[in-house]
Amino acid sequence: MLSQLPLFAGGEIVRGFGRGSKELGIPTANFPLEVVKSLPESLPTGAYYGWANVDNGPVHKMVLSIGWNPFYNNKEKSVETHMLHDFNCDLYGQTLKICIVGYLRPERSFDSLESLIAAIRGDIEQAKAFLDEADKAKLKEAPFFTEKLCSSK
């Protein structure tokens, strides 16, 4: 249900399948399964946009995928975040915080890798425009991005 947006989540960045950078040219930061499972089950799978930061650093625009990535026939649900910023290092082990602001489209399979890449590039362009709107831009300043995450044990 999209009425739950904006939605905040955070956790350690873990290794994914390695497809984002290598196959797609669109690197992603991936959450561990426990963070994925902590998201509301009623949240539709698909592409979203919002804000993200790493280790309480600067907040950047982002797009993310929530789901099973039908093009790749994933067996487990994943959350893969692509920040619209070039990082010059691996982010594994660092803390990723996200604010999911809006929904772009449902997940689906694609006929080719090229059509998947084109769809993601379109998502990125839409996200840039939406996040420039004042009501969405203000979420970049949410205290969540500078607060320490508490782990539940």
Swiss-Prot record:
One of its GO terms (biological process) is riboflavin metabolic process. Its EC number is 2.7.1.26. GO terms for cellular component: mitochondrial inner membrane; mitochondrion. It comes from the Eukaryota. InterPro entries: Riboflavin_kinase, Riboflavin_kinase_bac/euk, Riboflavin_kinase_dom_sf. Zinc or magnesium. It catalyses: riboflavin + ATP = FMN + ADP + H(+). Its main location: cytoplasm. Monomer. This is Putative riboflavin kinase. It comes from Drosophila melanogaster (Fruit fly).
